[in-house]
Amino acid sequence: IRDRDNKYTNIFEGKNVIVIHGESLQTNLMSLSFNGEEVTPNLNKLAEEGMFFSNFYSPVSVGTSSDAELMFNTSLLPTKSGTAFVSYSDRTYNATPKLLGEKGYYTFSMHGNNADFWNRRNMHKSLGYDRFYSKTDYNVTEENTVGLGINDYAFFDQSVDKLKKIAKKHDKWYGMMMMLSNHTPFSEVDKYGDFPVDIKETVTNEDGTTEEVTYPYMEGTKLGNYFKSAHYADGAIGELIERLDEEGLLENTIVVIYGDHDARLPRADYNRLYNYDKETDSILDKDDPNYKEYDSYQYELGRKVPLIIWSKDMKGTDLNKEYTNVMSMYDVEPTLGNMLGYSNEYALGHDIFDIKDQNIVVFPNGNWLTNDIYYNSQKEEYLSLTDKPVTEEEIKKNNEYASSLLDVSNDIIIFDLLKKDQTDENKVIEAQEKGA
């Protein structure tokens, strides 16, 4: 079932699409800077010039990056056990590459890792990609390797070379470029370039002379290393956009960037970020009036990832703004589909411009989030995010919706319902409409 037409319907119809799958990029990176230097200056610039969805979540399960791909492309949720990519790659999916292929697009995916990682070799065929470029299609050397494979700079550079050939052959194309460098454990600090995550201050001595004093702050911590890694990856995004522009590949093209999931770093690691005492190089005592509590709810709500839709001519238009309604990775296909002129009648997510502030983000563990409430299904308790009163009826209704959505999505994948003459269509539609 597709959402209603709205002012965004078909606005990007016929445009080429570049999707950037941003490994472990979180939204909170975008508000951080050290010594006046932003962690993600390029992401920030694209967000400022494009459509920035700032309340966006990627409710992945054990399939992490592959779960993000599943949700982004199919508007289904992760399976309850195992992963769709590994266990259910032979199923039928109404995926964006397949649906755009039916509209005459050439579709491809690019990733510098092994083709068998998360079984992408098989799953990308099921999603409808015409071509999957993987590690063997790239010139990978010891020098250009970071972490799991080719670094993002070399990957993007070689990918643009391939894209130039694709663009010459095909009038319309849709491609996903999957980043790799900003992958846990964020330990190759010597390769990330110079980005200190300390505090530098100029102090005036009694004799009037000045000197620069450095406090370690996040240096030597796993979270600090994550910031360095993310800054490195952000630089690669900046170079990619520049190169695409130089090659004329941004004409009639939209760029979609999303963070695939949060960095999965423990909550305790954030304590130093928010409660650092530079005088003692330690964490403030909980009794200190300046101590900031970072509880489990703040941690969960802080796991949001960026979603940016950008084109070189979008700045200053009506589209160029921040969109703040809660949104999930499985809402992207119906939202993007409405803009590009295709639809998946079995999408479990919604076009965010249709559902607006009535949206619900459902997580694989049964937790859910609206603009007003974050509900923890394990503890059976909620955090109210606004002054709006919360009723038991609303909690019950949303719990039923979350449970139904997870069940229906799981059944669609496991029992291959999109192939089996779609006899479960009514169940799908019922789940879609319950929380709408």
Task: List each language-model region with its residue ranges.
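Solvent-exposed soluble domains appended to multi-pass membrane proteins
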Residues: 2-436
